Amino acid sequence: LADAVENCRCAIHMAGSGMPGVFLAFNRKVILGTRASKVRTTSFHAFESINYPYVGEINSRGLDIRRSYIPGPKGSCVLERRLEEKVFLIKLVPGFDGKIFQFLYEQGYRGLIIEAFGMGGIPSMSSEIMDDLRDVIQKGMIVVVKSQCPYEGCNLSLYETGRTALDAGVFQARDMSTEAVVTKVMWILGKHWERKKIEEMFYKNLAGEISPQEEDMFYKGV
């Protein structure tokens, strides 16, 4: 069995709708590109929309587009080619050694995404992980913490370990997917902005990658 024909048909219908944006058409569903993530290797429902509704679906009437979930254009289309390739992704495991942060900094990495535990917890008791993390941030590295759980996002202000990380200067991914965070950091660092501008743009909803209420939490200081 193959689903290529059905996926192509769905993609063509979406392209013909005139809706702006980047989308993924798969298994009779359309996913906003900034929310798409591959979660299975062989199943027909291999892709899911992370923390966001599907923006389209094939039913008996054809392609049903949920226009209210599609972000409107914010200007003319511009092809961005300046991406920072020195961005690294780490998943925390028990026994993790924070010295890897310094190693990555010495190798020229400018951005680091850490997939932490639960709500975004980074072990800080009886370890030097937080000191190592704070050191590379002070040297200019941009560090983002997100949950290893793909759904429901992270809130570092909820527990002490998360608040300690925030005090060290990390950004939190809120409800963004891993793919969206990595891409966003590469794009932002390619701009060579100052840290204040980088932080502002990281928490700004650019293409539907972060939920509006999550964006509001940042600006309200929650």
Stretch-by-stretch model annotation:
Residues 1-28, 32-37:
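Short, glycine-/small-residue-rich phosphate/pyrophosphate-handling segment
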